[in-house]
Amino acid sequence: MEPGKKDYIDSPLRMQPASLSGASTPTIDLDGLSWPCQGTQRRIDTAEEEKVKKISNAISTILECLGEDPERQGLLGTPERYAKAMLYFTKGYEQNLTEVINEAVFQEDHEEMVIVRDIDVFSLCEHHLVPFIGKIHIGYIPRKRVLGLSKLARIANMFSRRLQVQERLTKQVAQAIQAVLKPQGVAVVMEATHMCMVMRGVEKPGSSTVTSSLTGIFQRSHKTREEFFRLIGKF
């Protein structure tokens, strides 16, 4: 790939993925924020054993650079365990909306707000590869179509199981629901504690970051936004 060239098509609508040759499964993302790059497709096509071996070798090198002995008893299995853990923490790269939704969209004559709050999420900051942990609150106002409630949590999990920044994660969840249901609007609020602010840097335990992403009527109507924030018990 040429330096600076994107692996996705950043069209005006930003809804068209770049074609990936040899793709065995569609990987769906939104808004050009996390389109699968060539490395993502390689991950999907590479055998699990090979991925674990490559990551394990890299971790052994890191341990040596830290002044440790990867061959000592306490660390003998650490590189392989870490490799398997990282593949699990980032399994969202191998998931897509079609599989996550699994046709759980239903016709329903309901046009009032639907909210699922306090969804626990765990992700990895893409800047330091350390965790951020928090909760997501999701609301939407249907337009004759509703989504199975568990699917809202599964969408949040799919995007959180990638290397992320909180702002992008919040926006991706909102845009995914908007794309799937085409409702009157979607509201997503996320609160999280970032270990990169707790364990290093400013070292401020107890601090939290709040982000939001609003579409449709939640953007246009102050009253609707206010109702959502009141119902999730925030602000």
From Swiss-Prot:
EC number(s) reported in the record: 3.5.4.16
InterPro entries: GTP-CH-I_C/QueF, GTP-CH-I_N, GTP_CycHdrlase_I, GTP_CycHdrlase_I_CS, GTP_CycHdrlase_I_dom
Residues engaged in binding Zn(2+): 125, 128, 196
Pathway: Cofactor biosynthesis; 7,8-dihydroneopterin triphosphate biosynthesis; 7,8-dihydroneopterin triphosphate from GTP: step 1/1
Span list, region Disordered: 1-27
Domain of life: Eukaryota
KW Aminoacyl-tRNA synthetase (keyword) present: no
Secretion signal span: none
Phosphothreonine modification, residue list: 25
Record field: catalytic activity: GTP + H2O = 7,8-dihydroneopterin 3'-triphosphate + formate + H(+)
GO-annotated cellular components: cytoplasm; cytosol; nucleus
Keyword annotations of the record: Allosteric enzyme, Folate biosynthesis, GTP-binding, Hydrolase, Metal-binding, Nucleotide-binding, Phosphoprotein, Zinc
GO molecular function, one term: GTP cyclohydrolase I activity
Pfam family name, one: GTP_cyclohydroI
Regulation acting on activity, per entry: GTP shows a positive allosteric effect, and tetrahydrobiopterin inhibits the enzyme activity.
Start-end of Polar residues biased regions: 18-27
SUPFAM superfamilies per UniProt: Tetrahydrobiopterin biosynthesis enzymes-like
UniProt-listed GO biological process terms: folic acid biosynthetic process; tetrahydrobiopterin biosynthetic process; tetrahydrofolate biosynthetic process
Complex formation: Toroid-shaped homodecamer, composed of two pentamers of five dimers.
Family, similarity comment: Belongs to the GTP cyclohydrolase I family.
Role description: GTP cyclohydrolase 1 is the first enzyme in the biosynthetic pathway leading to folic acid.
NCBIfam families in the cross-refs: folE (TIGR00063), PRK09347.1-2 (NF006825), PRK09347.1-3 (NF006826)
Name assigned to this protein: GTP cyclohydrolase 1
Organism of origin: Schizosaccharomyces pombe (strain 972 / ATCC 24843) (Fission yeast)
